[in-house]
Amino acid sequence: MTGRGKGGKGLGKGGAKRHRKILRDNIQGITKPAIRRLARRGGVKRISAMIYEETRGVLKSFLESVIRDAVTYTEHAKRKTVTSLDVVYALKRQGRTLYGFGG
């Protein structure tokens, strides 16, 4: 026993380093038609052209807060994988209870 806990790597035992794509401006992946479909589902008939960027900004800030809370739950449990329950608890903490995923 080396006392490193579970999943620790010893010296010289590191895995191969992979090149990771730099993530930037991925919010543009939420396309105009996707936003339009969400609005249609919500009962919206006509959409102003300025709505799309505003929607992306609001969605980004919402997801940042939910993910921050979910990662906090994950780190507290000493895990490296965010589970669906972490997200459910993060949403519940923000007053947006989600049913159907346990918890």
Curated annotation (Swiss-Prot):
GO molecular function annotation: DNA binding; protein heterodimerization activity; structural constituent of chromatin
Subunit structure: The nucleosome is a histone octamer containing two molecules each of H2A, H2B, H3 and H4 assembled in one H3-H4 heterotetramer and two H2A-H2B heterodimers. The octamer wraps approximately 147 bp of DNA.
PANTHER family: HISTONE H4
Transmembrane segments: none
Residues with PTM N6-acetyl-N6-methyllysine: 6, 13
Lineage: superkingdom: Eukaryota
Compositionally biased residues, Gly residues: 1-14
Stated name of the protein: Histone H4.2
Taxonomic source organism: Talaromyces funiculosus
Main location: nucleus
Keyword terms of this UniProt record: Acetylation, Chromosome, DNA-binding, Methylation, Nucleosome core, Nucleus
